[in-house]
């Protein structure tokens, strides 16, 4: 009696992304080393081996000889699984051209697409997407309808047909229920990155809490399918960075009003009930303009709660180094006063019309702040309303404890704006009086002339 046929298991190279124990990549073997002399080699296993090795011609020959491109081993893995794990885009394209299924699931439920995402094989991800691969389950997926968050948006309601990129490429514009919205997507390649998913989750949790006229409004999110997305209001007038590039220096009154908008939004973040929020990436590109000409603070992707001490050295990958406080750059403990430092740089830039330390690279600017250097005040003194320059200097003080809070900053700015309005009225009054005097003088002269003419007529 013949023994039952045992389906072989392919264990060379990277294993399924969902396997409980992933076998490390071994060194490269020849086919002779893998298969013993005299051993009858299963054609499907040979196909998986050639897929692992990237042998295009060998794969073509095997499939042409009748080997099924969808052959599965005992773990239900296919040659496409193997090629996706290894990141071999040419093999992936060949197998798909030879009718390989795009979304076969192995015994653990992993697809070639999920494997490519796990091993961060970007080129393979793109190829599989083109061929209709379905996104794996979202990391924030829930099991029952009751658990679906109230803010959940059906992705089919988002229309990207006229989409355009906005705010540093992080957001894009879309249509949702007849209105324009800004959509932030979590890229496919970071779905397997627990740290990135955690940041996305933290930003989402944070946005739900925020309700203020000077904070960009959160509308909803897609968390039960991929790609996961955050949806916020869309502000078509762009960001402060675009405005400064286009106009350069702003009028002092405009700069102070904008500073008040930013300060009010930041004061709300710092004094919100529960845990205060440190923005940590306050810079012109993250400050948006609404239709009424007011500013709103946006992009909380790297925001932190309360006091923070980073457990790893700071890098400039996540945020703009040009506007960060020295204590953040040097990985010291920092709090809400780090945002006050960034605010000072932005206010000065609005008056000066140029970025702080514009002649330096971003990281060099941060090093300058850490070395107790500050941007020079080059604009004429008349461009700085009384008290504004002093306020800026206090806000970028080297000692965070010496910097004012945003509540204090608001009071100071309101006083500066009031003084500017009063001064403007004072300048206008003499002119008005002079105009009235000239009018009365002309009126009296006309009367005098009329009286003279009248007297003459009676002679």
From Swiss-Prot:
Q: Which residues make up the binding site for ATP?
A: 108-116, 184
Reaction(s) this enzyme catalyzes, per UniProt? L-seryl-[protein] + ATP = O-phospho-L-seryl-[protein] + ADP + H(+); L-threonyl-[protein] + ATP = O-phospho-L-threonyl-[protein] + ADP + H(+)
Q: Which Pfam families match?
A: Ank_2, PK_Tyr_Ser-Thr
Q: Which InterPro entries match?
A: Ankyrin_rpt, Ankyrin_rpt-contain_sf, Kinase-like_dom_sf, Prot_kinase_dom, Ser-Thr/Tyr_kinase_cat_dom, Ser/Thr_Kinases-Pseudokinases
GO-annotated biological processes: integrin-mediated signaling pathway; regulation of stomatal movement; response to blue light
GO terms for MF: ATP binding; protein kinase activity; protein serine/threonine/tyrosine kinase activity
Query: What protein name is recorded for this chain?
Result: Serine/threonine-protein kinase 12
Q: Which organism is it from?
A: Arabidopsis thaliana (Mouse-ear cress)
